[in-house]
Amino acid sequence: MKSDFVEVCILGKTVGLKGALKLHDRSDFPNQFKNGAKFYDINSKEFVIKSYDRNNNLVIFENYDSIDLAKTLVNYILYRSINDTIRDCKLAKDEFFYFDIIGCNVFEDKILLGEVIDILEVGAGFLFSIKTEGDLVKAGLNSNFYIPYNDNFTQNIDIKSKKIQVKNSLDILKNS
C-alpha cells in the first residue's frame, strides 16, 4: 500500500444473506463510513459502500451484495486516501491525524530527542513511540522510548515544521 493511504477498518464475518459484513472501525472517525464512500485494499482495489448500518456496524459494498461474494472480503483490511481522510474527517482544536504526528522530530528545549515512529492507545490516553536520535543512542541511552501525549509532557505540536516540543521527556529517556 502506498504511503498516501491510511488504514481505517477490518472487515469481519458476514451477517445475513444480502452481503453484509461486520465492520471493525480502526479509526477515530466513524462518520467516514457512509453510502458512496470509497476505500481500498492492499492492492489498491476500490470498494464503494452501497449501504452502512451505523447502529450495528454492518456494511454492504457495491458488487458484493450476496453472502458468497461478501465472504471473499472477510478479514480484509481497508484503507482510505489521506486526501479523502483530511477532506471528510474534521478535527477539533488541538487534534491531529496520526499520519501528521508520525515522522515529527521531538525536542526538549533545543535537544533533539528523536522522531515519532508510532502512536499507541493505552487506556484513556496515548503514547508517542520515539526512535531516539543517534547521538543520544551512542551516548548509551535506549534506542526507543515512549512519551505520554498530555500536558505534563507535550508543550507544542507544529505539524507544518514537523516538530513537537516536549518537557520532562529527557528524564523518561534517561530512565528507560
From Swiss-Prot:
Q: What is its main location?
A: cytoplasm
Keyword Nucleotide-binding, does the record have it? no
Q: Which molecular function GO terms apply here?
A: ribosome binding
Domain PRC barrel positions: 93-172
- Secreted among the record's keywords? no
Per UniProt, the keywords (alphabetical) are: Chaperone, Cytoplasm, Ribosome biogenesis, rRNA processing
**Which segments does the entry list as coiled coil?**
none
Q: Where in the cell is it found?
A: Cytoplasm
Q: Please provide, in alphabetical order, the Gene Ontology terms of the cellular component aspect for this entry.
A: cytoplasm; ribosome
Q: Which InterPro entries match?
A: PRC_barrel-like_sf, PRC_RimM, RimM, RimM_N, RimM_N_sf, Transl_B-barrel_sf
State the Gene Ontology BP annotations. Answer: ribosomal small subunit biogenesis; rRNA processing
| Domain remarks | The PRC barrel domain binds ribosomal protein uS19.
Similarity-based family: Belongs to the RimM family.
Subunit structure, interactors included: Binds ribosomal protein uS19.
Quote the function comment for this protein: An accessory protein needed during the final step in the assembly of 30S ribosomal subunit, possibly for assembly of the head region. Essential for efficient processing of 16S rRNA. May be needed both before and after RbfA during the maturation of 16S rRNA. It has affinity for free ribosomal 30S subunits but not for 70S ribosomes.
Protein name, per record: Ribosome maturation factor RimM
Which organism is the protein's source? Campylobacter fetus subsp. fetus (strain 82-40)
Give the taxonomic lineage as stored in the record: Bacteria, Pseudomonadati, Campylobacterota, Epsilonproteobacteria, Campylobacterales
Q: Which gene encodes it?
A: rimM
